Amino acid sequence: MTGFGARLAEAKAHRGPLCLGIDPHPELLRAWDLPATADGLAAFCDICVAAFAGFAVVKPQVAFFEAYGAAGFAVLEGTMAALRANGVLVLADAKRGDIGSTMAAYAAAWAGDSPLAADAVTVSPFLGFGSLRPLLEVATANDRGVFVLAATSNPEGATIQRADADGRTVAQLIVDQVGLFNSEVGEVTGSEPGSVGVVVGATVLNPPDVSGLGGPVLVPGVGVQGGRPEALGGLGGAAPQQLLPAVSREVLRAGPSISEVRAAAERMLDSVAYLSAV
């Protein structure tokens, strides 16, 4: 299998540089006239799968599935399988983070051979970047991707992410460590794009420098959260092709009509299409 970095680059080139979120929170289920049950969750996801077929990347927010226990995880597994059957890359927004054998278990679940394993997964480096090593290694071995939280758009994040770490912010330290990992893997895989990226919010002021990352930058917060799609170019010194804007509510609030959700997604894709420029 080709590495995630190369698959992502190909998907963006052919389907556009946009990641669409599936965030089935109870308020949205009610707005779509669906019950806040596992059955309502499944119906919501069926609409999203139909609307998002043909797009590059879809990001299910795992927490909203966990809320329904085993039934929710079953819906998540089925949704991921249906998306991938349509050629869509699946990014599991799980934000996992731990140490040792526990992190190894997360690695097996989200980046190994489990039914939950996605094309890529989000992780938290709060326990130290080295704590992510088990998952990074499993993901690399299985040609999957990882997105490491670096500079998030929530105001509370700045307390830690902008703290000084030997002359650079914690966010910059994380970006630099990811860049080093991509360089190490690149010595083995050659010129293939890096498969480990970072998360930098669209509304972050003074974002970290990602020009040396060697991997993709997931940019959530576009749309309702205040990020302007036309203002993403050059974020953190990124090349246009590095950026992967992510949008959820701006598109999902157009539901429950499949055609309306798809039309909203296409409008957002049009607004970020300039990021595909070579």
From Swiss-Prot:
One of its GO terms (molecular function) is orotidine-5'-phosphate decarboxylase activity. It catalyses: orotidine 5'-phosphate + H(+) = UMP + CO2. Keywords: Decarboxylase, Lyase, Pyrimidine biosynthesis. Pathway: Pyrimidine metabolism; UMP biosynthesis via de novo pathway; UMP from orotate: step 2/2. It holds the Pfam family OMPdecase. GO terms for biological process: 'de novo' pyrimidine nucleobase biosynthetic process; 'de novo' UMP biosynthetic process. The keyword Lyase applies. Belongs to the OMP decarboxylase family. Type 2 subfamily. This is Orotidine 5'-phosphate decarboxylase. It comes from Mycobacterium ulcerans (strain Agy99). The gene is pyrF.
